């Protein structure tokens, strides 16, 4: 159970990526001895999405948010804060025991239709996507390049309603 004098804050930062951005943010958290419970970052075409879930003492949370707002402004990024309840955090932690699967989608090129079909099957089976990662290099715009390969990895969690049916549906794509 979370002590009464601590707060859980989900920090979401978006905007143009640049070297030192994550260091600047975590330096502020370190200044107030915050504990980072989870962190994730994605960069798509130089656009950053950074999430940090931290625990801090209640008397520090306002100072942390104020300093992060000023730092975000000086870096030209957007920062948002979301309070997380103890119950929400505990429910999230308890999800780690669920089954985890890696699904890899491979082709010469991958269309929105193909990705939509895969993710629809996963959703219908009650699976949750934790992460999506491109495993191949950046795809050139020249579609005549026959050596191009595209590969995306989905990290999914949960127990499928019907694993065999899910596998059959995925193999038919």
Question: How does the language model describe each region?
Answer:
Residues 1-173:
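A conserved regulatory-domain signal marking ACT and ACT-like small-molecule sensing domains
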């Amino acid at each position: 159970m979370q002590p009464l004098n601590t707060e859980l804050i989900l920090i979401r930062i978006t905007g143009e990526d640049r070297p030192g951005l994550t260091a600047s943010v975590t330096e502020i958290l370190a200044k107030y001895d915050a504990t980072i419970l989870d962190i994730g970052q994605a960069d798509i075409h130089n656009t950053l999405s950074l999430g940090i879930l931290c625990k801090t003492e209640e008397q520090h949370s306002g100072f942390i948010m104020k300093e992060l707002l000023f730092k975000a402004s000086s870096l030209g990024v957007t920062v948002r804060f979301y309070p997380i309840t103890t119950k929400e955090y505990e429910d999230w932690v308890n999800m780690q025991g669920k089954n985890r699967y890696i699904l890899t989608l491979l082709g010469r090129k991958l269309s929105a239709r193909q990705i939509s079909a895969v993710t629809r099957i996963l959703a219908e089976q009650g699976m949750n996507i934790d992460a999506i990662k491109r495993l191949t290099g950046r795809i050139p715009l020249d579609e005549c390049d026959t050596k191009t390969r595209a590969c995306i990895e989905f990290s999914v969690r949960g127990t499928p309603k019907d694993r065999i049916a899910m596998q059959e549906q995925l193999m038919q794509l």
